Structure formats: C-alpha cells, structure tokens
C-alpha cells in the first residue's frame, strides 16, 4: 500500500511538472510568434513609453528611506 501511494505521488508530481511546463512553453512560443509576426516589429514602439529615464526627487527620497 505504501509503494502504491508513493508511485501515485510521484506520478502526480510529474504530471504537474509536465502540465505547467507545457503552459510556460506555450506562452513563450506565443511571445516569439507575436514578436516576429507581420506587425510584431512595428508594435515595439509602444514599449518606449514604459521606460522613464528620469528619477524624480520623490523617488530618490523613497530610495534613501529604503536604504536606511
């Protein structure tokens, strides 16, 4: 009975690993397809708005408080 339970647990863990890796690999593949798709490279201009190179005084004060 203990052996059967151990085999069941190992099988469940392996099944979970397979199911989760399949989902992760699927999302990675969708990202690659959208990046190199017909309009994928022209849509990268929207990413420029996400990066703000300037750090405000409030951000610096917050970082100083964090480092204390």
UniProtKB/Swiss-Prot annotation:
Pro-peptide positions on chain: 40-68
Post-translational modifications: IsCTf is an enzymatic proteolytic cleavage product of IsCT by the proteases present in the venom.
Signal peptide residues on this chain, from the entry's feature table: 1-23
Tissue-specificity statement: Expressed by the venom gland.
GO BP of this protein: defense response to bacterium; killing of cells of another organism; monoatomic ion transport
Major subcellular site: secreted
Modified residues (Phenylalanine amide): 36
GO MF annotation terms: toxin activity
Keywords: Amidation, Antibiotic, Antimicrobial, Cleavage on pair of basic residues, Cytolysis, Ion transport, Membrane, Secreted, Signal, Target cell membrane, Target membrane, Toxin, Transmembrane, Transport
Residue numbers marked as site, Important for antibacterial activity, and hemolysis activity: 29
GO cellular component, one term: membrane
Subcellular location: Secreted; Target cell membrane
Family under the similarity heading: Belongs to the non-disulfide-bridged peptide (NDBP) superfamily. Short antimicrobial peptide (group 4) family.
Name of protein: Cytotoxic linear peptide IsCT
Organism of this sequence: Opisthacanthus madagascariensis (Scorpion)
Lineage: Eukaryota, Metazoa, Ecdysozoa, Arthropoda, Chelicerata
